Amino acid sequence: MSVMASLQDRTDGTFAGDEWGEKDTRFLYGALNALSLLRLLDLVDTELAVKHIQACINFDGGFGTSPGAESHSGQIFTCVAALAILGRLDLVNKDKLGGWLSERQVPNGGLNGRPEKLEDVCYSWWVLSPLAVIGRLHWIDKEALIKFILKCQDTEHGGLADRPEDMVDVFHTYFGIAGLSLLGYEGVLEVDPVYSLPKTVIDRVIGKRSWT
């Protein structure tokens, strides 16, 4: 874990993905996720990490990969989840962000990652997770999204694709099922929206959280 902690830049709070230094909020979230589960957040400067996340907030309430980068659902997940881990959800404009995220739903019920892009099953997680954390999950049409996700199934061999009729893969299968969990779909184990792990596991490891 000391290696992971060493990847934080102590001048601006960012985290690199490796020794060669590429930085963005994905690496920040990944580090905070792992360190918090091991109760080792004291190895990094969490206040500086929060300041960096604040610098990534955009006028539309969303977050980008770095300060000034456009809002994207995947990066919003990493930033909101990181703030949840650090107990700083007070920094999120929940109504503004909830509005931007709910606008990601397109007419066929699916969700896209940013304006004018195609829908994709994986955004059933990247969009729904922050909506769940900020208490705005009811701002989308849940039934329409469930229908879209189920249409992306390979009913013969199993699995989920990014869109109906496309090839299934593990990535989209996982995030599609995780999205169904957040939607309360019957028979799917409850997933924690911050850690993307079974809620029973998170409750056992670090206790019940305020966002659940």
What are these regions (language model features)?
Residues 1, 9-12, 46-50, 94, ...:
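Core helices of alpha-solenoid repeat scaffolds
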Residues 82, 87-107, 119-212:
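Terminal, non-catalytic domain-edge segments
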Residues 2, 29-32, 51-54, 77-80, ...:
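Register-specific detector for alpha-helical tandem repeat solenoids, activating on a conserved position
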Residues 1-14, 21-47:
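Hydrophobic, ordered structural segments
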Residues 4-21, 53-74, 98-122, 149-167, ...:
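Glycine- and aromatic-rich loop/turn segments at beta-sheet edges
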Residues 22-26, 44, 70, 74, ...:
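Residues within HEAT/ARM-like alpha-solenoid scaffolds
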Residues 26, 30-33, 74-81, 126, ...:
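Alpha-solenoid helical repeat scaffolds
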Residues 23, 36-39, 71, 84, ...:
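Tandem alpha-helical RNA-recognition repeat domains
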